[in-house]
C-alpha cells in the first residue's frame, strides 16, 4: 500500500471526529406512508434514537444530519444538543447525500484530515460504546474502517428464482455503520467512485484501499422492512426497561437482597440422520447429516430455551411448544427462543448472560461460532458479548462420540429488581 500516504491527508493538528447521518431517503421498502426514519419507535421518531447515541459520545465534535431539500421534519423538532447540525442538501442517492454533507462540513470548519463517521439513520439501535469501539480501532489506522459482522447464514447465488450455487461464507462479512474515514479521503473517493456506491467502504475500496473490519453487534441492523420495526421496538423497550432499573449511587451499595437472581440450566440431545439440514444456534452448517426432531431440531437453541424457561420457573420447552402440536412441526427454533424470552421478560426478568456448549464429534464448529453468537444475541435482544458458545467432542465415546447424535448444554442468568 505504498500509495496510501498520498491519499491520506496528513497534518500536525489533532484531528476531530464528525458524524454524518444521511437522512434524505424515502424508505420505500419499509412500507411506511412517510420516510421510515421519522416513524415512531418506542415513543419517538427512529432518527432521534440514532442521534441520542451519537450525543452520548464526547469525542464526536458535531453531528450533521443531511435531509432532503423539502424536508421540514427538523423544523418542528427541538434539538437540545448544540452539537447537532441539519443541512437540507440531500441528494438522489445515499452517496450523493454523503458527498454533499462532506462539502457542507468543510464549510463549517472541518478539515480534510478530520475523521468522519457516516451512519445510517435507520440503524437506530447503535449504542455509544459501539461508536467508541470503532473510533478506538480506527484512530491510528492508515485507512479507516467500519463495523461489520461475520455472515451468519448460508449464502446462495440465485438464477431465475432458483438456487444456482452455494457460496463459501467463511470470509464473508455483513457491512454495518458507522463507517469511519478521513474526511478528505472519503470526499475524493466518492468523487471518483460516483454516487451509485452503496456504502463509503465501497468508495474507499475503489481507490485500492482495504478498510478495517471492526466487529459490530447483531442488534445494529438497519430497519428496512415492515417486520423490522417490531424487532427494533422490542429491543428499544428492553433497553428502556433496563435503563429505568434502580441504579447504584457512588455513596450507596445495593444489597444483593435488592435483586432477585435466577440461574437456569438446559440440556438437549437429538439424533443425526440423513436428509435433514444441520442447524445449530440458528446457523445452517454444511454437513451430510442433520438433527432429527419435530421442529428444526436446533439442539443448541433448545438447550438455551430450556435454561431460560427453567430460570424463570416456567417449565420447559415441551410445556410451551409441545411436539404433539402441529403448529410447531418444522418450527424455526429462533422464533421459539424469541417467544420464550418474551414470556420470561413478561415475568419481570432481565437476561444477564447465556453460556452454552455443543457436544459433537463432527463437523468442526469453530468457523461458525461467531455467527451462532450473533443469531442468539439478536433473538434474545442482547449484545453479542452477553452470549457465549463453546464446542466440545465426546472423545469418540457414546452415541455423540460415534457421530450418531449431538448434545447441548446451556446456563442462563436472569435478574429482577425487587
From Swiss-Prot:
Its EC number is 2.7.7.60, 4.6.1.12. GO terms for biological process: isopentenyl diphosphate biosynthetic process, methylerythritol 4-phosphate pathway; terpenoid biosynthetic process. The gene is ispDF. The keyword Acetylation does not apply. It catalyses: 2-C-methyl-D-erythritol 4-phosphate + CTP + H(+) = 4-CDP-2-C-methyl-D-erythritol + diphosphate; 4-CDP-2-C-methyl-D-erythritol 2-phosphate = 2-C-methyl-D-erythritol 2,4-cyclic diphosphate + CMP. A divalent metal cation binds at residues 268, 270, 302. The keyword Cell cycle does not apply. Pfam families: IspD, YgbB. 4-CDP-2-C-methyl-D-erythritol 2-phosphate binds at residues 268-270, 294-295, 316-318, 321-325. It comes from the Bacteria. The record marks 169, 222 as: Positions MEP for the nucleophilic attack. GO terms for molecular function: 2-C-methyl-D-erythritol 2,4-cyclodiphosphate synthase activity; 2-C-methyl-D-erythritol 4-phosphate cytidylyltransferase activity; metal ion binding. InterPro entries: IspD, IspD/F, IspD/TarI, ISPD_synthase_CS, MECDP_synthase, MECDP_synthase_CS, MECDP_synthase_sf, Nucleotide-diphossugar_trans. Keywords: Isoprene biosynthesis, Lyase, Metal-binding, Multifunctional enzyme, Nucleotidyltransferase, Transferase. Bifunctional enzyme that catalyzes the formation of 4-diphosphocytidyl-2-C-methyl-D-erythritol from CTP and 2-C-methyl-D-erythritol 4-phosphate (MEP) (IspD), and catalyzes the conversion of 4-diphosphocytidyl-2-C-methyl-D-erythritol 2-phosphate (CDP-ME2P) to 2-C-methyl-D-erythritol 2,4-cyclodiphosphate (ME-CPP) with a corresponding release of cytidine 5-monophosphate (CMP) (IspF). The record marks 29, 36, 294, 393 as: Transition state stabilizer. Residues 262-418 are annotated as: 2-C-methyl-D-erythritol 2,4-cyclodiphosphate synthase. In the N-terminal section; belongs to the IspD/TarI cytidylyltransferase family. IspD subfamily. Its cofactor is a divalent metal cation. Transmembrane segments: none annotated. Residues 1-261 are annotated as: 2-C-methyl-D-erythritol 4-phosphate cytidylyltransferase. Pathway: Isoprenoid biosynthesis; isopentenyl diphosphate biosynthesis via DXP pathway; isopentenyl diphosphate from 1-deoxy-D-xylulose 5-phosphate: step 2/6; Isoprenoid biosynthesis; isopentenyl diphosphate biosynthesis via DXP pathway; isopentenyl diphosphate from 1-deoxy-D-xylulose 5-phosphate: step 4/6. This is Bifunctional enzyme IspD/IspF.
Amino acid at each position: 500500500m505504498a500509495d496510501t500516504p498520498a491519499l491520506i491527508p496528513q497534518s500536525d493538528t489533532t484531528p476531530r471526529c464528525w458524524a454524518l447521518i444521511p437522512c434524505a431517503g424515502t424508505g420505500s421498502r419499509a412500507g411506511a406512508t412517510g420516510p421510515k426514519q421519522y416513524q415512531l419507535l418506542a415513543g419517538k421518531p427512529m432518527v432521534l434514537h440514532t442521534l441520542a447515541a451519537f450525543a452520548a459520545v464526547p469525542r464526536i465534535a458535531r453531528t450533521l444530519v443531511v435531509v432532503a431539500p423539502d424536508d421540514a421534519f427538523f423544523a418542528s423538532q427541538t434539538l437540545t444538543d448544540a452539537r447537532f447540525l441539519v443541512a437540507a442538501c440531500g441528494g438522489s442517492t445515499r452517496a450523493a447525500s454523503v458527498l454533499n454533507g462532506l462539502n457542507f462540513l468543510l464549510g463549517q470548519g472541518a478539515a480534510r484530515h478530520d475523521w468522519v463517521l457516516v451512519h445510517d439513520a435507520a440503524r437506530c439501535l447503535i449504542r455509544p460504546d459501539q461508536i467508541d469501539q470503532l473510533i478506538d480501532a480506527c484512530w491510528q489506522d492508515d485507512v479507516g474502517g467500519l463495523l461489520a459482522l461475520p455472515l451468519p447464514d448460508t449464502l446462495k447465488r440465485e438464477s431465475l428464482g432458483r438456487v444456482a450455487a452455494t457460496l463459501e461464507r467463511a470470509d464473508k462479512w455483513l457491512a454495518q455503520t458507522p463507517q469511519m474515514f478521513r474526511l478528505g479521503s472519503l470526499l475524493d473517493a466518492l468523487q471518483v467512485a460516483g454516487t451509485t456506491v452503496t456504502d463509503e467502504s465501497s468508495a474507499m475500496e475503489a481507490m485500492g484501499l482495504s478498510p478495517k473490519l471492526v466487529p459490530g453487534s447483531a442488534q445494529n441492523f438497519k430497519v428496512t422492512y415492515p417486520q423490522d420495526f417490531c424487532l427494533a421496538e422490542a429491543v428499544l423497550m428492553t433497553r428502556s426497561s433496563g435503563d429505568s432499573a434502580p441504579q447504584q449511587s457512588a455513596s450507596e451499595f445495593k444489597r444483593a437482597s435488592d435483586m432477585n437472581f435466577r440461574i437456569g440450566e438446559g440440556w438437549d440431545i437429538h439424533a443425526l440422520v440423513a436428509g435433514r439440514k444441520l442447524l445449530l444456534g440458528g446457523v445452517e452448517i454444511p454437513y451430510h447429516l442433520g438433527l432429527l426432531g419435530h421442529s428444526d431440531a436446533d439442539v443448541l437453541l433448545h438447550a438455551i430455551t430450556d435454561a431460560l424457561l427453567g430460570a424463570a420457573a416456567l417449565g420447559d420447552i415441551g410445556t410451551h411448544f409441545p411436539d404433539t402440536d402441529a403448529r410447531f412441526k418444522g418450527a424455526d427454533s429462533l422464533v421459539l427462543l424469541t417467544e420464550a424470552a418474551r414470556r420470561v421478560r413478561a415475568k419481570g426478568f432481565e437476561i444477564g448472560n447465556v453460556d452454552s456448549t455443543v457436544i459433537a464429534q463432527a463437523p468442526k464448529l469453530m468457523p461458525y461460532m461467531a455467527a451462532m453468537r450473533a443469531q442468539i444475541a439478536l433473538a434474545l435482544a442482547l449484545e453479542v458479548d452477553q452470549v457465549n458458545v463453546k464446542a466440545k467432542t465426546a472423545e469418540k465415546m457414546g452415541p455423540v462420540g460415534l457421530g450418531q447424535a449431538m448434545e447441548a448444554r446451556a446456563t442462563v442468568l436472569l435478574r429482577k429488581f425487587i
